[in-house]
Amino acid sequence: MNDCLELKITNAMHRIEDLYFKTGGKCYLSFSGGKDSTVILALIKMCEDILTIPKNSIPAVFCDTGIELVATKDFVIWVKNNWYKNVEIIRPEKTFTWIINNKGKPVKSKIKSQFLSRYQKGNTSKNTMLNLLGKNKKVIKAKIANKDLHMIHPDFDIKVSDSCCLILKKKPFEKYNKENDIKGYIIGERIAEGGARELSASKRVNMGGEDMHQNKRSVYS
């Protein structure tokens, strides 16, 4: 095995073990059914194989938002039945349709939706406009393309909101955290995937790798 890859795997396993013991086992993997969190689950199983953490001790928590691909849901069920027993499925209280009808529609990306929503709510401050027009290099991901400038025209009648992620994903996990006295959680994310995750991971790297929020661990990047 490549020495660099082996070192990354070892470091990732150490971070998983460290979080497990620092939280007294009150932690989980945020499992999306995608390749990144599946890699983390494989690393958790590797820790179990060498007996550094108990078997099936870290729940892999999947949030069924109702808008995942059928193939993703099928894979999560397969994992639970065939590969890792401790998979828990949680669900949001509201549906995607309810969000569209009551909060607004997500467009382009979470960051763009956030600033477009602020603009539509009357926040026409200089900073908001600079972000949408790409003049603020710190949040360049908020820039809307020239072909989308009609979205800031007064006649644009589609209500935009970034509430989708908050209601469908963040709130269900917050509820799970509270109900289970969770002290920390693990995610798999790559800086290269861009958007809000890139900004979050980059900030963490700039802070010297210190974990942010509630003992959140991104065990590899």
Language-model segments: residues:
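ATP-dependent adenylation/nucleotidyltransferase module used to activate substrates
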Residues: 1-220
